[in-house]
Structures are given as structure tokens and as C-alpha cells.
Regions:
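Activation segment signature within eukaryotic-like protein kinase domains
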Residues: 117-118
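AlphaC helix of the eukaryotic protein kinase fold
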Residues: 47-69
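Protein kinase glycine-rich loop
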Residues: 18-24, 29
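Protein kinase catalytic-loop region centered on the HRD/HxD motif
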Residues: 121-133
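Conserved HRD-motif arginine in the catalytic loop of eukaryotic-like protein kinases
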Residues: 260
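A short, aromatic-enriched beta-strand patch in the conserved N-lobe beta-sheet
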Residues: 80-82
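Conserved short submotifs of the Hanks-type protein kinase catalytic core
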Residues: 86-99, 103
Length: 299
């Protein structure tokens, strides 16, 4: 199937269109130059054909959530949001220079980098969870890299408040990084399922594939879902990945949510311990804003 052409970039007061950055199923991302302050920004714009009251509400929810959380250094910074003159909602964010969506399959990512990224994204999740917010779509493709080389969590498009969320409402999911209970539709998400997804994401950065992909086998969503429910993750298969790190990731991907780390903070600390055991500098907790307090978030 051929990819669709990007939509027409909207005319926005105070912004000058530069070029297309990317396209997705629901919208496009464009590079604009903002006039005041003068800087380049990324503007995510919904496609006109998908805009309806429900989608508009979800998009506004994403804007609100990200504006509240984006003061965290590992969450994509949001500058403003609005509706264009032709009725398309848009979100203005910082520009990122890369991400892990394609890179994890194309390159061998160093262990130290995978650990740093896992710790920083765990810190972002901890902040979201304390605000009673679940992301619901943690995967390599939703981790971007800023111009300063820092990983940031993006795309809270299907996130929701834990207390306001409706567990009976189905949401989109990325099967390779979805926890067993989400696959079974026992829940649309929880702190425990987010830890599973983050463990699966760190695994993917190291292995170059998602945890239940089997080289040479049928890795369609249906077969992956079956393995997620019944099988153990494939070994990472790298001699430079210590056994302790595989143990930490397998624990995070336990079938039973109770057996996983009890918070993103606990998972981050386990990754930090692996850093220490490898003689690596421990990722600075101050830069990730981790501490020992916990929000009362549903598991």
C-alpha cells in the first residue's frame, strides 16, 4: 500500500511553514518557524477527515496532559495548542532530531544508552503516574530524541486520567509492546501494564526486535498476541548484555502484574543498579526528578 501524501500545512498566525516532518494515521507533523520568540517548532495537525467531536476531545486532552507534564525533562515540551482557520486542531511542540521508532531495528544500541533511556523514560512515567495519568502506548516509536540528545516521551494521544478513564472503552494499542492483561482486554491500562511496556521497550532497544518476535516465524499481531499471553520473551542474544539486565527486564514483563516492579521508580532503580554493576555512571536522579514518594495510581 502506498503512503498517503501529507495534508496541506495550515496557515497559522505567527508561524511560517518550513517543511513536512512526518505523517501518521491521524495527522501530520510539520516544521514551522515561530516568529516570536524566533525558533523552530514542530506542529502536529490532525487530518480533516478524522476530526469529529470525540477525536477533537481526545486531541484537546492530549494537549492539556502534555502541557501539564512537559515541564519534566523527559517529556516532550508543549508550547501551545489551538484550532486552525480550517478547523483542524494543532499542537506546537519542541523539535526533535530523531527517535527510536526505526533506529532500534537499524542499529545496535549500546547497553549504556538503553539503560539511560529506560531510566529517563521511567522517570517521565513516574511523574505521569503521580499525576494520575497513564500513557497507554509506550513503545520505541514514542520515544524521541531532542537536539541535546535527551530522550523524551511523546504522544499522549490515547492517554487518560486514571480516575476519569473509562475501563470499558477500548483504546488503540501497539501489540508488540502491550501487556498480557491489555491483550486480553482485562484492562485498558494500569501502572503495572505501563511497566510491562517500558520493560518491553528497553528490551527492544537492546535486541533490535520486540520481545516476542521470532526471526523467521509469523510475527503478525495475532501471533505476537498469542506469544505474549503464553510464552516467555526470546533471549536478547547479545554477549554484552549482562544476565542481571535480562532478569530485570523479564521481571518487568512478568505475566502476573503483581510480580512486576510496583512503580516506574522501582524499575528505574533496578536499571540504575545494573549501571552500577557495569561500572557505568549512574543516571542522575536530579535530572530525571525521581524521589521516593508515590502517587496512589491504579495497578
Amino acid at each position: 500500500m502506498s503512503r498517503r501524501l501529507p495534508s496541506t500545512p495550515p496557515v497559522l498566525s505567527g508561524f511560517t511553514f518550513v517543511r513536512v516532518l512526518g505523517s501518521g494515521g491521524f495527522g501530520d507533523v510539520f516544521l514551522y518557524e515561530q516568529q516570536l520568540p524566533r525558533r523552530n517548532v514542530a506542529i502536529k495537525v490532525l487530518l480533516p477527515e478524522v476530526v469529529n467531536p470525540r477525536v477533537r476531545d481526545m486531541f484537546q486532552s492530549e494537549a492539556q496532559l502534555m502541557s501539564q507534564l512537559s515541564t519534566h525533562p523527559s517529556i516532550l515540551s508543549v508550547f501551545e495548542a489551538g484550532v486552525s482557520s480550517d478547523g483542524r486542531p494543532y499542537l506546537v511542540t519542541e523539535v526533535c532530531v530523531g527517535g527510536y521508532g526505526e533506529r532500534f531495528r537499524a542499529e545496535t544500541i549500546p547497553v549504556a544508552e538503553a539503560l539511560r533511556t529506560g531510566i529517563r523514560i521511567a522517570a517521565a512515567l513516574e511523574t505521569a503516574h503521580r499525576a494520575n495519568v497513564l500513557h497507554r502506548d509506550i513503545k520505541p516509536g514514542n520515544i524521541l530524541v531532542t537536539a541535546y540528545g535527551h530522550p523524551v516521551l511523546s504522544d499522549f494521544g490515547i492517554a487518560s486520567s486514571v480516575y476519569l478513564g473509562d475501563n470499558s472503552t477500548a483504546v488503540g494499542l501497539s501489540v508488540p509492546w502491550s501487556a498480557p492483561e491489555v491483550i486480553r482486554e482485562s484492562t485498558t491500562g494500569s501502572t503495572a501494564s505501563e511497566i510491562w511496556s517500558l520493560g518491553a521497550t528497553v528490551y527492544s532497544l537492546l535486541a533490535g526486535r520486540s520481545p516476542f518476535e521470532v526471526p523467521g516465524k509469523d510475527n503478525s499481531p495475532g501471533h505476537l498476541a498469542g506469544r505474549i499471553l503464553k510464552s516467555k520473551p526470546q533471549p536478547i542474544g547479545r554477549s554484552d548484555v549482562p544476565a542481571r539486565l535480562e532478569e530485570v527486564l523479564n521481571k518487568a514483563m512478568s505475566k502476573n502484574p503483581i510480580d512486576r516492579p510496583h512503580s516506574a521508580l522501582e524499575f528505574a532503580r533496578q536499571l540504575q543498579q545494573v549501571e552500577t554493576s557495569l561500572g557505568l555512571p549512574q543516571t542522575d536522579r536530579k535530572s530525571t526528578r525521581l524521589n521516593s514518594s508515590h502517587a496512589n495510581v491504579s495497578r
